[in-house]
């Protein structure tokens, strides 16, 4: 299990960079270059058909690098998302243990983040 890595983090709602309440969690597990994601969000503001842009971010020197992984189309205000990604579906050089967190954007100034 030496190649197994996991991130488990709460997801908070952000409005104009201000951290609000905790509304869910993300669990990301990577083993043998396969990434398994579990995301749960319970937010009454989450409407049917909203697009959430799923991005991971990491610190690289003085800068932050944001990598978009996927887009999620919501079905209801209690969203539960399970997905697996092969090495070919991941951004080049993606390594879960190097990631600092995750962001799910739905508008420029409104998002969920760890």
Model regions: which residues?
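N-terminal targeting/export leaders
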Residues: 1-114
């Amino acid at each position: 299990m030496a190649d197994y890595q996991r991130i488990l983090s709460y997801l908070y709602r952000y409005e104009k960079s201000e951290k609000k309440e905790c509304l869910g969690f993300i669990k990301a597990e990577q083993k043998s270059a396969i990434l398994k994601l579990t995301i749960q969000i319970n937010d009454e503001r989450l409407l049917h058909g909203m697009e959430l842009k799923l991005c991971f971010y990491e610190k690289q020197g003085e800068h932050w690098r944001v990598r978009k992984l996927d887009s999620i189309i919501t079905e209801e205000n209690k969203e539960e998302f399970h997905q697996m990604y092969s090495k070919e579906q991941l951004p080049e050089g993606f390594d879960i243990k190097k990631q600092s967190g995750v962001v799910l954007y739905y508008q420029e100034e409104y998002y969920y983040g760890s």
